[in-house]
């Protein structure tokens, strides 16, 4: 009688052990399956904008799309304020719509600095524009409600100013409209000569605007 109870207990223990092992194996297998998914990370740098220009409040109907420079003057110098516009074609990066931007940085080369430090604002443009854009036409464009990012520029030229624009580029990758950015400064200035910030345009052929994207797919 005692031996029979012992055998039954041993069999029950064996069944329990087997079931427990099988459950653990299933969970482990799921983790292995999840870990086997391939995540590709890469970097793409777009050198040169598809379109870039600046607009001048003091020359409201003039286009500067072929200029070698992108000139910016803060709003405090009105009516001589100037805005910069830049847009990049991301198709060369071939990032799938299922991918996403881990980081994205817009870089502009400040070839000539103002005499006072600027706080440059990069604001997403939400309607289409062309290289023939004028100041008057820029007033009819639509923009995001607030700047995507701001970057401080000093009083020394020959440096690059970087703008983190990850949230916008991630939207572009996922199918959002890509009309680039407006670069402006809402600060008060001294005068239109002292406060002129000059960036190199794509037409300059050197130190052109770039957009660097670290992404996953």
Label the predicted regions:
Residues 1-42:
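Long, small/polar-residue-biased beta-strand-and-loop interaction regions
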Residues 8, 12-15, 92-95, 168-172:
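Short, surface-exposed loop/turn segments at beta-strand-coil junctions that are enriched for proline
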